Structure formats: C-alpha cells, structure tokens
Amino acid sequence: MLPVITRFARPALMAIRPVNAMGVLRASSITKRLYHPKVIEHYTHPRNVGSLDKKLPNVGTGLVGAPACGDVMRLQIKVNDSTGVIEDVKFKTFGCGSAIASSSYMTELVQGMTLDDAAKIKNTEIAKELSLPPVKLHCSMLAEDAIKAAIKDYKSKRNTPTMLS
C-alpha cells in the first residue's frame, strides 16, 4: 500500500509516512523487518517534535542536512543560563525513519545534560542504541552535527555584545 498524507498525518515531521484511515501512523511489515524496534518506536511516536523561539537568548538552533539523501534536521535547545543545563529540546526533521528516530532519541538523550556533556555525544552512541545499519549511519551523524550546531549557536549568542541605544 502506498503511503498517504491526510489531515491526520503529523505535518511537524514533514515526511511522507503511512497512516491508516483513522490517521494513526502505522509501520508496514516491510519496515518492521528492516528496522530495529527502537527505530520504529521513535519513528511512530517521536519525542519532542516542535519549535522553540529562536530569538530568545537562551535558545540555540542547529540546522544540518545530508546532501547524500536529502535529510534535513533542525534541533533546538533551551539552556538554563545559570547552570548550563539543557532544559528543553525540540526538533523537526525532513527525512527517513532513521533520521526521525535519531533526532527523537537525541532529544531524549540531551535533556537535562550540561552543554559540555551534550557536546561529547558521538553518532556511534546513537547508532548503537538504535541498531542502525551501516547504510543509515549518516542519520546518526546528522543528530550529532545538529546538537553541536545548536550548542555553537547558543554560545555565539552569549558571546555577542549587546547594543545599547
């Protein structure tokens, strides 16, 4: 059966994903055979989808893409300025199930971490947790690049002198 987009599909993820007549996302039998259950779980029930206000000084935004497959990932972090702890994380991903799952898992992983600890996360950790096949390792690399870009954006906002009128 071909994937369909209905008004019930999750537009926040911007990926064509199969839904049934009731608008419930379903994983096909082919998907279940090709992906680890953790990928399917994060793909069908992604965590922390959405946006934060990028204009806020304590929000960092990382936007990365993979030219090889066309996946694009935006990950945003909200940081407690006094503690350096990531208080909230949101993502939007245009891409395959592995890219969506990698984004979703990354948001769960970094929430509550310090910026230094979050910057140390490697794609291999994500790939191992989700049991990604070698052909999908670029998806976990996107998640690593996205968190590093978000941290860099947050830090650049903190180091920018303010203009006084």
From Swiss-Prot:
Q: Which GO terms describe its molecular function?
A: 2 iron, 2 sulfur cluster binding; ATPase activator activity; ferrous iron binding; iron ion binding; zinc ion binding
Question: Is Iron given among the entry's keywords?
Answer: yes
Pathway(s) this gene product operates in, as recorded in its UniProt entry: Cofactor biosynthesis; iron-sulfur cluster biosynthesis
CDD domains xref list = IscU_like
Q: Name one GO cellular component term.
A: mitochondrion
> What effect is documented for mutating residue 136 to A?
No growth; no interaction with SSQ1
What, per the annotation, is the impact of changing residue 134 to A? Slow growth; no interaction with SSQ1
Task: For this entry, list what GO says about its biological process.
Answer: intracellular iron ion homeostasis; iron-sulfur cluster assembly; tRNA wobble uridine modification
Is Mitochondrion found in the keyword set? yes
Superkingdom of the organism of origin: Eukaryota
Cofactor binding description = Binds 1 [2Fe-2S] cluster per subunit. Zn(2+) binding stabilizes the monomeric form.
User: Which cofactor is recorded for it?
Assistant: [2Fe-2S] cluster; Zn(2+)
Share any extra remarks: Present with 10800 molecules/cell in log phase SD medium.
**Functional summary from the UniProt entry:** Scaffold protein for the de novo synthesis of iron-sulfur (Fe-S) clusters within mitochondria, which is required for maturation of both mitochondrial and cytoplasmic [2Fe-2S] and [4Fe-4S] proteins. First, a [2Fe-2S] cluster is transiently assembled on the scaffold proteins ISU1 and ISU2. In a second step, the cluster is released from ISU1/ISU2, transferred to glutaredoxin GRX5, followed by the formation of mitochondrial [2Fe-2S] proteins, the synthesis of [4Fe-4S] clusters and their target-specific insertion into the recipient apoproteins.
Protein's name according to its UniProt entry: Iron sulfur cluster assembly protein 1, mitochondrial
